[in-house]
């Protein structure tokens, strides 16, 4: 788990209160420890990365200690939504805030040596992160000289994802920008409750979204809730990297918009309906309104009786209620341990979103029926039947 923090002189963490730009941090942490080391055996290791920093993005690479100009190869095997279709060899890896990746690194060639995991300045030019004297360092691996037997290998194929042909038309365009010092999406902030739903997507359809970073010298990792998407394209006045091979080999829910970059993502909006968020995952930008919502709309004549339908954000069962601040401080009343356990048990008994297979099958049947209806009504007025269930995993 990667993070970066500022400390005050007394050793306490510096607060983000009042910060409206970014909180980069000058102390790099891995699993809560500043610049740690790990003793490893000379064999294959599977390493999982989560960027949990408030704002800092990482451009990671491995080198032998003291030899900075010779990056070492590794295999990327998974991203936000799980395994890739196949391992992708790389010598560096961009990990923006909230992104997750898994790699396999082979330490067998470096018995008795030390390997450093390092970070390119300004995320190799993709980001605008402030750099400090040691933010180019992440951690060290100390490789044992004792021989071990390791018969593990990375399969050539990891899983099957049936990617179909690209859509040719963009369904929605979203511009991430700053206006009068405020972070916005298409001119709207999340506090604008009447206007913050920027897209209505029919349940079970596939859409192509264009995400544009037009905020000048900033970058934005964009997180879309509910869905796993495919990164289709990346372009822009300062973009030269395109879609990274390890991005396109799997599905994701966070994509990084570097300076002046635009990215196309394609997602299947299913199986649930309801209102979901999408936002910048730089937590300072997110907390200062760079967030909006999309509504996966109900299907007419769907015909499936969902017992765990949580699409209504105004459902009185989950609405905020007045409380006694004295009970909150004393942890009594509704804040007592017994009351909290009772509430958690009540939520568990609701079994939210437990009908995944049933709802998915019902959506399959719904769209097959509608596709047949359209075929039987050639020449008659009929709405377009969306492409459904693009991603079979």
Locate predicted features.
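Active-site pocket scaffolds in enzymes
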Residues: 69-91, 138, 167-388
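Fungal secretory targeting signals
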Residues: 392-393
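Predominantly extracellular/luminal regions of secreted and cell-surface proteins
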Residues: 1-12, 158-183
């Amino acid at each position: 788990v990667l993070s970066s923090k500022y400390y005050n002189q007394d050793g306490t963490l510096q607060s983000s209160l009042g910060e409206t730009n970014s909180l980069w941090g000058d102390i790099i942490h891995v699993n809560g420890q500043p610049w740690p080391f790990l003793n490893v055996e000379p064999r294959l290791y599977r390493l999982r990365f989560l960027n949990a920093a408030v704002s800092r993005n990482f451009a990671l690479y491995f080198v032998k200690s003291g030899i900075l100009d010779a990056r070492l190869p590794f295999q990327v095997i998974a991203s936000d939504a799980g395994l890739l279709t196949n391992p992708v060899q790389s010598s560096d890896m961009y990990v923006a805030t909230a992104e997750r990746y898994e790699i396999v690194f082979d330490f067998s060639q470096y018995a008795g040596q030390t390997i450093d995991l390092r970070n390119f300045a300004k995320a190799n030019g993709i980001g605008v992160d402030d750099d400090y004297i040691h933010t180019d360092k992440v951690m060290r691996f100390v490789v044992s000289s004792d021989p071990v037997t390791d018969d593990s290998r990375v399969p050539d194929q990891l899983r099957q994802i049936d990617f179909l042909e690209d859509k040719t038309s963009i369904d929605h365009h979203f511009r991430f920008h700053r206006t009068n010092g405020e972070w916005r999406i298409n001119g709207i902030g999340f506090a604008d409750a009447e206007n913050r739903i920027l897209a209505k997507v029919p349940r079970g359809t596939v859409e192509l979204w264009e995400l544009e970073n037009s905020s000048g010298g900033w970058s934005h990792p964009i997180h879309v809730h509910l869905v796993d998407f495919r990164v289709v394209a990346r372009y822009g006045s300062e973009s030269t990297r395109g879609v990274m091979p390890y991005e396109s080999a799997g599905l994701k829910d966070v994509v990084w918009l570097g300076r002046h970059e635009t990215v196309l993502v394609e997602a299947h909006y299913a199986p649930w309906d309801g209102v979901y968020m999408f936002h910048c995952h730089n937590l300072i930008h997110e907390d200062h309104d760079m967030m909006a919502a999309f509504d996966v709309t109900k299907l007419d004549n769907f015909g499936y009786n969902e017992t765990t339908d949580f699409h209504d954000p105004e459902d009185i069962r989950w609405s905020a209620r007045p409380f006694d601040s004295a009970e909150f401080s004393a942890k009594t009343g509704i804040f007592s341990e017994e009351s909290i356990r009772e509430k958690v048990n009540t939520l568990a008994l609701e079994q939210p979103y437990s009908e995944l297979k049933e709802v998915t099958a019902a959506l399959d049947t719904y769209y097959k029926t509608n596709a047949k209806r359209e075929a039987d009504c050639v020449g008659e007025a009929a709405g377009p039947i969306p492409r459904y269930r693009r991603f079979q995993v």
